[in-house]
């Protein structure tokens, strides 16, 4: 029991960076992911409440081009401006809709990109 108390004391004295490094080392050593038990615990609880909480906490969004609309040239120009892609790559993305224009962006940036693309004539989803 004294050994466990010593381990608790040692862990309590770790800095945040040291704790993160310890977590990574344990994940590698044991072949597990620290995120998995949290997700399972959330799913095991009140399923409806957990889903609503996950929806509220979402911080990264994907901007999906669902349809280029009638004004495809303006949409291609806007996609090029947003992504920095070349003309051919932007054209392929627009013609291959539905496709992700940008992934893992903030809510504000996703709303801004959606407005720009819709102003150019595209139909856009934010997920």
UniProtKB/Swiss-Prot annotation:
Keywords: Ribonucleoprotein, Ribosomal protein. One of its GO terms (biological process) is translation. One of its GO terms (molecular function) is mRNA binding. GO terms for cellular component: cytosolic large ribosomal subunit. Disulfide bonds: none annotated. Gene3D superfamilies: 3.30.1390.10, Single helix bin. Belongs to the bacterial ribosomal protein bL12 family. Homodimer. Part of the ribosomal stalk of the 50S ribosomal subunit. Forms a multimeric L10(L12)X complex, where L10 forms an elongated spine to which 2 to 4 L12 dimers bind in a sequential fashion. Binds GTP-bound translation factors. Forms part of the ribosomal stalk which helps the ribosome interact with GTP-bound translation factors. Is thus essential for accurate translation. This is Large ribosomal subunit protein bL12. It comes from Sinorhizobium fredii (strain NBRC 101917 / NGR234).
